[in-house]
Amino acid sequence: MPLNLQKNLPAIELLKKEHIFVMDSLRASEQDIRPLRVVVLNLMPLKITTETDLVRLLSNTPLQVELDFMKIKGHTPKNTPIEHMQEFYKDFDEMADDFYDGMIVTGAPVEQMPFEEVSYWEEITQIFDWARTHVTSTLYICWAAQAGLYHFYGVPKYDLPAKMFGVFRHSLREPFVPIFRGFDDEFFVPHSRHTEIRREDIMKVPELTLLSESEESGVYMAMARGGREFFITGHSEYSPYTLNDEYMRDLGKGLPINKPRNYYRNNDPAQGPVVRWRGHANLLFTNWLNYYVYQETPFRREDIKKLGSL
């Protein structure tokens, strides 16, 4: 797809090597069509890695997409050059008057803290509230899914006795919802988290629809407002070696960590991973952009504030 990215974003050259079509803003300006605007609130520590993972998956629509990156004000990442943040990211205050066709809020390494003790909790809840009036459809991923469910619907999270870590089989509860168009009856998703949300809490909230779950890893996806909000507990966006990198990182730190389940060929890290989630990851993001962003967003972006449930 012609994904329109700010010139010099590292993901451009990385994905060109994978034969994925992206264009910088100069070339995109020559195409006379209304692009979709998508904003990513990137809370992950390795921001360039997450950017590349998301761009890879957003690259499968025939529509032009303008991608912006948002950051938490006053928060200085430890693993990303400050020059990169200054060039490609904006604070929420700078974007609060804008409207977006789609938004993605990533996970964050704060899941074992109570929500209210997260240093940027007040700001992120302001962003969540803003998204309801300024964004057509939002994907909340991993910790962001837990945070959004808690903020909007009072759904709690629970500590797990051991990290949910690996690639797990999932089933569809609502197979005819467009977000699952083209999905198989069962599909695989990576998970990497120390906490969970529980189906009984989702089922208590009439505004929420439980879409998919796993016998091993529990709730995977819930939907609200007819698809204006999706809460996704797994990491479909992960590249093949992300779980391996997390495993080796924790081993190197001497942390208690088991091998990611259902991941390595013959359960042997030396043999590398078996990738079983790539196809459904691409379908997930393509379907979201098509059915919940492109087909539902008004031509005049400022009319997003008039939208109800889809």
Swiss-Prot record:
Q: Where is the active site?
A: 142 (acyl-thioester intermediate), 235 (proton acceptor), 237
Q: Which Gene3D superfamilies match?
A: 3.40.50.880
What is an annotated GO biological process for this record, any one? Answer: L-methionine biosynthetic process from homoserine via O-succinyl-L-homoserine and cystathionine
Where along the chain is substrate bound? 163, 192, 249
What keywords would UniProt list here? Answer: Acyltransferase, Amino-acid biosynthesis, Cytoplasm, Methionine biosynthesis, Transferase
**Does the keyword Hydrolase belong to this entry?**
no
What is an example of a GO molecular function annotated in this UniProt entry?
homoserine O-succinyltransferase activity
Alphabetized InterPro entries for the sequence: Class_I_gatase-like, HST_MetA, MetA_family
Residues the record annotates as the site (Important for substrate specificity) are: 192
What EC designation does it have?
2.3.1.31
Taken from the UniProt entry, a GO cellular component term is:
cytoplasm
Give the UniProt subcellular location, in the record's own words.
Cytoplasm
Give one Pfam hit by family name.
HTS
- Its catalytic activity? L-homoserine + acetyl-CoA = O-acetyl-L-homoserine + CoA
Sites marked Important for acyl-CoA specificity: 111
What class does this enzyme belong to in the EC scheme? transferase
Q: In which pathway does it act?
A: Amino-acid biosynthesis; L-methionine biosynthesis via de novo pathway; O-acetyl-L-homoserine from L-homoserine: step 1/1
Predominant localisation class: cytoplasm
What is this protein's function?
Transfers an acetyl group from acetyl-CoA to L-homoserine, forming acetyl-L-homoserine.
Hey, which family's this protein in? Belongs to the MetA family.
**Protein name as annotated:** Homoserine O-acetyltransferase
Task: State the organism's lineage.
Answer: Bacteria, Pseudomonadati, Bacteroidota, Bacteroidia, Bacteroidales
Gene encoding it?
metAA
